[in-house]
Amino acid sequence: SIYLRSETRMEASRWMFQNVPSAVNLSIEADDATYNQPLPMPQGFPILPDAPYNLAFVPKADGNLTEIIFGYARDEAGIPASVELTLASASQPDLALGRASSALDSTLMADPRGAPLTFAFDEAIPLSKDQSYTLTIETNGAALLLQGSAIVNETDYDWGLPFRIDGYDPYGGLYSNED
């Protein structure tokens, strides 16, 4: 690289990927720090009770998965529902590495996008960088909708943040720019 320091817009983009919630966010305890890995989700895609959604991903850091956070979750019918997660290695899809569940009560939400929903595993799940995993998302409600944060660019300058960097595509399912 010809640069002596990191370019500020690239560092700002990296900061956003670590701190601005997408639809699905992995919290990986790595060494002395937590690495937050956002995962893309199709905008407006309903997860139905009889059709679990399988989300394939590859961790960008070695460490222990302690929790998964949905940026915004809501049940389309606005009824209380249970949401269950199952994590498996892609090489052994029938062997669950961990399970977690959480209750979603859409009746208490003022935000039309829904509310954050946190899933904590009973035990931390070791993840290996560059190994493939599958996260299965299931609901017993009408239709589960997940959404990431909405990013607003208040400028006509054509270099709005965040940039595509480190394998992340901010508008490819991580964030919305339609709200």
Show which residues each predicted segment covers.
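C-terminal luminal/periplasmic domains and tails of membrane-associated envelope-modifying transferases
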Residues: 8-179
